[in-house]
Amino acid sequence: MRTLWRFIAGFFKWTWRLLNFVREMVLNLFFIFLVLVGVGIWMQVSGGDSKETASRGALLLDISGVIVDKPDSSQRFSKLSRQLLGASSDRLQENSLFDIVNTIRQAKDDRNITGIVMDLKNFAGGDQPSMQYIGKALKEFRDSGKPVYAVGENYSQGQYYLASFANKIWLSPQGVVDLHGFATNGLYYKSLLDKLKVSTHVFRVGTYKSAVEPFIRDDMSPAAREADSRWIGELWQNYLNTVAANRQIPAEQVFPGAQGLLEGLTKTGGDTAKYALENKLVDALASSAEIEKALTKEFGWSKTDKNYRAISYYDYALKTPADTGDSIGVVFANGAIMDGEETQGNVGGDTTAAQIRDARLDPKVKAIVLRVNSPGGSVTASEVIRAELAAARAAGKPVVVSMGGMAASGGYWISTPANYIVANPSTLTGSIGIFGVITTVENSLDSIGVHTDGVSTSPLADVSITRALPPEAQLMMQLSIENGYKRFITLVADARHSTPEQIDKIAQGHVWTGQDAKANGLVDSLGDFDDAVAKAAELAKVKQWHLEYYVDEPTFFDKVMDNMSGSVRAMLPDAFQAMLPAPLASVASTVKSESDKLAAFNDPQNRYAFCLTCANMR
């Protein structure tokens, strides 16, 4: 018996030692990881990640991930993220549109940069106005006499759009230029909510305000289908026209439709690369070795890199413009508009208003450019931003809005105080309408034997997700939504020198492209960010200026924690999706995207000016 007790005691003793060893090892590894991340970030902050070209060569435009107006603060340490998690982790990588454009423009005047090579295999896309803006910079580079080349084993639709701005496009002999058109799709939950016995109460104004349809339908309404088909067709035609002009071929040759594409592939025996070459989508078919040889002849050989001489976009040092005294403040509204402080990928009403206020109070800032790339969101937060922008204009500082890929619904609400609005022809804007959704689960609880009861001094004191929504509360909510809509169209009417009745005819939640918005008087001119800045300078009557970007600078500790937590947040869904078959992984990604949108809905009055179809555009 004593031997047995010794064995049991020994077993627990050694088990405890093993657990203690594992605990200490995990803590030590965590500490080492923390130190490495901190050192890596310190090196990047101190400029260790940038280097000048020591000799003449190409700028390698090897964009990895997506293009956004304003990357999340932790994304500025992208090199460290790529080193820790691999370049394929494009989920983690956000690239500043303006950094890319400024880099290309700096390279144009850099004697050590003799050309650009676009290697876009890890490029995950961006909205059409953003890529047009990059294309403009690439054209300026070409016009300076320096060549632009595009290389790729395959080209997705977004990758090919950028590649079309090149002097020459190479494609692998086994590659494909994958053109298929645009789509906007979303998930619809009505049947699911019915099965769960969830009661959905929808309040809206606007025939075309389709953001609530997922809660009350299992498919698109005819009105939403008609409206979305129109603007998505316009965007696709803009895509084809741009590529056709770049390649100097007819738009019908870029994409002849599904049937025409099938006939063309039949003639080439299914050889997608041959089809691309014969239809002048690319200039040459070549292997990696052949492309390397051609680029080496153009740019020279690097003994260190054992490749043609080039410097990555991520290593090329972007110079800070000189402080000329006067400045034009640039404030970003990038993402869904939320009440409160800014979160990753979303616009915080309080954060953005504070940035506008800082620009208003800075005597060196002579004008403000609000860069909007948002499908809208919280009405309360939108009004907070709008009011602060109106205060800046009232203080005598010109306000110009530059619309990016989207400036819809709440994104248009915050644009109304501007002296001048510049939109891209492919901007999605309008969507002037308001909605609210309240779900209650009293029937769900009842079906499993859970009931709610109590007393209250009025029906309004007993509003809860676990009880049926009182009729009085429903009527009050609808009145609030209708009042918000009247407020919206009145703001637009005052800003556009029109009447609420006239604005109502083009509102009702209707989405417009920038081109149509110009025709309807919702914007002042068509152009890009450069045009908006030039207009701001003109209104402020300044001859020399520099741009002052208003972004929240995180502390060093925040940078360390953001990289760590951001990496973990990104790796977990990636790891989960990696274990799923491809079709299920795609569904999981869609579900996560939908849940992220719902998480951004935090308006205290449950009122939203949000364009769901704009956010679903791809």
Curated annotation (Swiss-Prot):
Effect on the protein of changing residue 412 to F: No effect on activity
Deletion phenotype: No effect on processing of liberated signal peptides in vivo.
Subcellular location(s) per record: Cell inner membrane
Gene Ontology biological process terms in this record: signal peptide processing
Example of a GO MF term: endopeptidase activity
Keyword Protease found: yes
Cytoplasmic side: 1-24
Membrane topology: Single-pass membrane protein
Effect of residue 252 to Q: In strain: ECOR 38, ECOR 39, ECOR 40, ECOR 50, ECOR 65 and ECOR 68
Record's GO cellular component terms: membrane; plasma membrane
Keywords, sorted A to Z: Cell inner membrane, Cell membrane, Hydrolase, Membrane, Protease, Serine protease, Transmembrane, Transmembrane helix
Enzyme class: hydrolase
Domain of life, per lineage: Bacteria
Free-text activity regulation comment from the record: Inhibited by serine hydrolase inhibitor FP-biotin and by antipain.
EC number in record: 3.4.21.-
InterPro entries, per the entry: ClpP/crotonase-like_dom_sf, Pept_S49_pIV, Pept_S49_SppA, Peptidase_S49, S49_SppA_1, S49_SppA_67K_type_N
Residues annotated as catalytic: 209 (proton donor/acceptor), 409 (nucleophile)
Periplasmic side: 46-618
Notes on the domains: A tandem duplication in the protein fold creates an intact active site between the repeated domains of each monomer.
Subunit structure: Homotetramer.
Purpose of the protein: Digests cleaved signal peptides in vitro, its in vivo function is unknown. This activity is necessary to maintain proper secretion of mature proteins across the membrane.
Family stated for the protein in its record: Belongs to the peptidase S49 family.
Protein name: Protease 4
